[in-house]
Amino acid sequence: MSAVRPLRPERQAQKQARGAAARLSGRRAEVLAALWLMAKGYRILGFRLATPLGEIDLLAQRRGVLAVVEVKSRTSLEAALEAVTYEQRSRLRRAGAHIAANRAGLRDAVVRLDLIALAPGRRPRHLLNAWPNTGNDGQ
């Protein structure tokens, strides 16, 4: 095995700048998605919500539904759907169930995994129940 060489300072700075730009872009996408959901009558319960099972981009509620919303900024809806792996879907499903079970007022809510796909120059696409729990979760 060879040792991993550290990045040159200029490469490290470029990598950090790309990471910062990606985080800012992600936050902007989440704010836009939250505004879209609020316009559709959802109440936003949390942004980048940390749970023992992982982070949820947006947690929203409307009527008896608790929507665990994954936000993806991609060129197409298909690319956004493909960007969320089986492991991520499983983690999101468990995190949503954990929140519903541990928060008063949400115990009877139906937990649903939604996707909001954002693409440059297009309206946000809100895909309800993007990954139905079919037992094999699309595998």
Swiss-Prot record:
GO MF term (any one): nucleic acid binding
Superkingdom in the source lineage: Bacteria
Coiled coil: none
Record family assignment: Belongs to the UPF0102 family.
Listed HAMAP family: UPF0102 (MF_00048)
Protein name according to UniProt: UPF0102 protein Caul_0175
UniProt source species: Caulobacter sp. (strain K31)
Upper taxonomic lineage: Bacteria, Pseudomonadati, Pseudomonadota, Alphaproteobacteria, Caulobacterales
